[in-house]
Amino acid sequence: MSVDEILTLAQGVVQSWDWATEVSRPRPERLDVKVKEIKQLLPIIVGLRVKRLGYLSAIVGVDLGVEANEIEVIYYFCPESAVIALRVRVPRQGATLASLSDVIPSAEVFERELREMFGIEITGLHTTDHLYLPDDWPDGVYPLRRDFDRAAIAGAGDEV
């Protein structure tokens, strides 16, 4: 299948949730999907998986700042040389997303990173141990948030 055929098929899957999504093609090889209702994220991902439309290449967080009071989470799927980006916004405080690890086992490492670096609670994780940060890292301090304060971590990670 060509890249255009792949993305057209993916767009067809996503359009099943047209009330909950906004779709754009910013470049010929890319499909961007803004998921407006968090509860629709998992069914859309399952729909893409059923059609074998790529592998999960990354889940990334982007802190939109204190003023926006949101974090955007982007799920990247790569079928061949195409890119499908599913974007969902969550509140900076008390954000919760369901784990994809039962559907896509490799998602767990990305989800643990979101939890640790941005403070997004991921329900259904198989382990909640620290992935990158030291065990004595202070609770409630998230290093990839824009308002991260280095003074809050004085001494963290000093134990050997």
Regions found by a protein language model. Give the residues of each.
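Terminal low-complexity/charged segments
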Residues: 1-160
